[in-house]
Swiss-Prot record:
<dbReference type="InterPro" id="IPR010203">
    <property type="entry name" value="RraA"/>
</dbReference>
<dbReference type="GO" id="GO:1902369">
    <property type="term" value="P:negative regulation of RNA catabolic process"/>
</dbReference>
<comment type="similarity">
    <text>Belongs to the RraA family.</text>
</comment>
<dbReference type="GO" id="GO:0019899">
    <property type="term" value="F:enzyme binding"/>
</dbReference>
<dbReference type="GO" id="GO:0005829">
    <property type="term" value="C:cytosol"/>
</dbReference>
<dbReference type="Pfam" id="PF03737">
    <property type="entry name" value="RraA-like"/>
</dbReference>
<dbReference type="InterPro" id="IPR005493">
    <property type="entry name" value="RraA/RraA-like"/>
</dbReference>
<protein>
    <recommendedName>
        <fullName>Regulator of ribonuclease activity A</fullName>
    </recommendedName>
</protein>
<dbReference type="GO" id="GO:0070207">
    <property type="term" value="P:protein homotrimerization"/>
</dbReference>
<dbReference type="InterPro" id="IPR014339">
    <property type="entry name" value="RraA_gpbac"/>
</dbReference>
<comment type="function">
    <text>Globally modulates RNA abundance by binding to RNase E (Rne) and regulating its endonucleolytic activity. Can modulate Rne action in a substrate-dependent manner by altering the composition of the degradosome. Modulates RNA-binding and helicase activities of the degradosome.</text>
</comment>
<dbReference type="InterPro" id="IPR036704">
    <property type="entry name" value="RraA/RraA-like_sf"/>
</dbReference>
<dbReference type="GO" id="GO:0060698">
    <property type="term" value="F:endoribonuclease inhibitor activity"/>
</dbReference>
<comment type="subunit">
    <text>Homotrimer. Forms a ring-like structure with a central cavity. Binds to both RNA-binding sites in the C-terminal region of Rne and to RhlB.</text>
</comment>
<dbReference type="GO" id="GO:0008428">
    <property type="term" value="F:ribonuclease inhibitor activity"/>
</dbReference>
<keyword id="KW-0963">Cytoplasm</keyword>
<dbReference type="GO" id="GO:0042802">
    <property type="term" value="F:identical protein binding"/>
</dbReference>
Length: 161
């Protein structure tokens, strides 16, 4: 499904929170949306592998990487795992790498920057926790919509049709 965050903001102005414009689109989908699962991890993506092995249909993984752009939390291998398990998208408050490969994949990926250095894989972090970045607080179960214009968040799903 295609989402237009500008149109959604016009219709649901009182019901959405708008994430500050810190992110760029690195995935092959221009827009994506779904119910979110939150993760907090710093320069370590081991926990992301565990989560992205689950069925992601209708879901978006929101990762608070502490805003670090020193190590990439998502690479092509991890993004392919997300595609294989039907995740709608990834929002990374941090960095990604292998961007030429990422843009070929049928998944939305919003991140702050790209860097060639990969993350550790120790599995340090926590999931289903409140995370805060970009002026917005995210809770697992909220609904996120993203396109090339921006990212918005709603407690309840928005009626798109």
């Amino acid at each position: 499904m295609k989402y237009d965050t500008s149109e959604l903001c016009d219709i649901y102005q009182e019901d959405v929170n708008v994430v500050e414009p810190l992110f760029s689109n690195f995935g092959g989908r221009a827009s994506f949306g779904g119910q979110i699962i939150t993760v907090k991890c710093f320069e370590d993506n081991g926990l992301l592998y565990d989560l992205l092995e689950q069925n992601g249909r209708g879901r978006v993984l929101v990762v608070d990487g502490g805003g670090s752009v020193r190590r990439a939390l998502v690479d092509a291998e991890l993004a392919r795992l997300a595609v294989q398990n039907e995740w709608e998208g990834l929002v990374i408050y941090g960095a990604v790498r292998q961007v030429d490969d990422l843009e070929e994949l049928d998944i939305g990926i919003q991140a702050m920057a790209a860097i060639p250095v990969g993350a550790a894989g120790e599995g340090i972090g926590e999931s289903d926790v409140r995370v805060n970045f970009g002026g917005v607080t995210f809770f697992s179960g909220d609904h996120l919509y993203a396109d090339n214009t921006g990212i918005i968040l709603s407690e309840d799903p928005l009626d798109i049709e």
